[in-house]
From Swiss-Prot:
Phylogenetic lineage: Bacteria, Pseudomonadati, Pseudomonadota, Alphaproteobacteria, Rickettsiales
Protein name from the UniProt record: 3-hydroxyacyl-[acyl-carrier-protein] dehydratase FabZ
GO annotation terms (biological process): fatty acid biosynthetic process; lipid A biosynthetic process
Keyword annotations of the record: Cytoplasm, Lipid A biosynthesis, Lipid biosynthesis, Lipid metabolism, Lyase
Principal location listed in the UniProt entry: cytoplasm
This enzyme's EC code(s): 4.2.1.59
Molecular functions (GO terms): (3R)-hydroxyacyl-[acyl-carrier-protein] dehydratase activity
Function of the molecule: Involved in unsaturated fatty acids biosynthesis. Catalyzes the dehydration of short chain beta-hydroxyacyl-ACPs and long chain saturated and unsaturated beta-hydroxyacyl-ACPs.
Homology family: Belongs to the thioester dehydratase family. FabZ subfamily.
Catalytic activity line of the entry: a (3R)-hydroxyacyl-[ACP] = a (2E)-enoyl-[ACP] + H2O
Origin: domain of life: Bacteria
A cellular component annotation (GO) from this entry: membrane
Name of the top EC class for this enzyme: lyase
Length: 145
């Protein structure tokens, strides 16, 4: 099931310049999700990171993983309209390859565990078949206030 940017914005609250998922390529609710982020030079982080050699910040790669996980949670639950997904912990984040404008990040997220409102994930970002980043992280789902 492919999910385009319009539907992505129905599932998560993020918007430009902080929406970091362009398309969902595959989703298996309660299991895994794969999506992409096309990295372009006109994104605001590249004005300072770094002007002479733009490099995608590692924390934004982890944020893209977390946003894709939020879509997976929403699709697994059927809706998160009255809920919010909060990142609680990031573990073992590793950055193995520079990601720069022109690259397409392929992001894969797997649910490792889910207990009540706490979900644990593992994720990788690949570019041209090479691992660029990997991380484990935990998120909490809460009712909106």
């Amino acid at each position: 099931m492919i999910i385009d940017i319009t539907e992505i914005m129905d599932w998560i609250p993020h918007r430009y310049p902080f929406l970091l998922v362009d398309r969902v390529l595959k989703i298996d609710p309660n299991k895994s999700i794969t999506g992409i982020k096309n990295v372009t030079v006109n994104e605001p982080q590249f004005t300072g990171h770094f002007p002479a050699r733009p490099v995608m910040p590692g924390v934004l790669m982890v944020e893209a993983m977390a946003q894709l996980a939020a879509i997976l949670v929403a699709k697994s639950l059927g809706s998160t309209k009255n809920k919010e997904v909060f990142l609680m912990a990031i573990e073992n984040a590793k950055f193995r390859r520079i990601v720069q404008p022109g690259d397409t990040m392929h992001i894969h997220v797997v649910i490792d565990q889910q207990r009540a409102n706490v979900w644990k994930f593992s994720s990788t970002v690949t570019v041209e078949g090479e691992i660029a980043a990997e991380s484990k992280f935990t998120a909490m789902i809460k009712d909106k206030a």
